[in-house]
Curated annotation (Swiss-Prot):
GO process annotations (BP): translation
GO molecular function, one term: rRNA binding
This protein's name: Large ribosomal subunit protein uL3
Cross-referenced SUPFAM superfamilies: Translation proteins
Keyword Iron-sulfur belongs to the record: no
Species name: Listeria welshimeri serovar 6b (strain ATCC 35897 / DSM 20650 / CCUG 15529 / CIP 8149 / NCTC 11857 / SLCC 5334 / V8)
UniProt entry tagged with the keyword Ribosomal protein: yes
Length: 209
């Protein structure tokens, strides 16, 4: 069954194993996760658990939001996400979800919004090769051929310069190196999408090896 939690990316560091192996890890702080609603097939057509993350001031939330969180006897939340394929019996409305739902060695998927890079060319954005830099070449970092003459247009999906980054990215099959219950922190092996302080969604891997 799926387990999930929301957190903020603190940054990256490194830890050492007992045999001296260095492991780069991403630190994710996952405090203030509260179960807001349990959805069932009878009432909603599917099963899921709705989790709210990070308190926000009541004046910043509207009446429907305040009424929704009042059923869970908690404060308005800044982020609300759903996790499907869960065991609903393990969750109680209004209960806090802590990082100990995961254990060291668990394989997870991490979802976040990638860093925005602004307007970029095809070499940086799509990894294309540049042209010759000498011998009279006047073609260096341009997109290249736009296609044949006959259609009198550029085909859809042609790789061109444009806005790069700022997209939702999921990195699969990452390993949890350490779970710190006291500080509500997860250490995940490798990098996780997003800038520092960005929202990160952690859930059980769908394609675990």
């Amino acid at each position: 069954m799926t387990k999930g939690i929301l957190g903020r990316k603190v940054g990256m560091t490194q830890v050492f194993t007992e045999n001296g192996e260095l492991i780069p890890v991403t630190v994710i702080e996952a405090a203030q996760n509260v179960v807001l609603q349990k959805k069932t097939v009878e009432t909603d057509g599917y099963e899921a658990v709705q989790i709210g993350f990070e308190d926000k001031r009541a004046k910043l939330s509207n009446k429907p939001e305040q009424g929704h969180v009042a059923k869970a006897d908690t404060t308005p939340k800044r982020f609300i996400r759903e996790f499907r394929d869960v065991n609903l019996d393990e969750y109680e409305i209004g209960a806090e979800v802590k990082v100990d739902v995961f254990a060291e060695g668990d394989i997870i998927d991490a979802t976040g919004v990638s860093k925005g890079k602004g307007f970029q060319g095809v070499i940086k954005r799509h990894g294309q090769s540049r042209g010759p830099m000498a011998h009279g070449s006047r073609y260096h970092r341009r997109p290249g051929s736009m296609g044949p003459v006959a259609p009198n247009r550029v085909f859809k999906n042609k790789l061109l310069p444009g806005r790069m980054g700022g997209e939702q990215i999921t990195i699969q099959n990452l390993e949890i190196v350490k779970v710190d219950v006291e500080k509500n922190v997860l250490l995940v092996k490798g990098n996780v999408p997003g800038a520092k302080k960005a929202l990160v969604q952690i859930k059980t891997a769908t394609k675990a090896k």
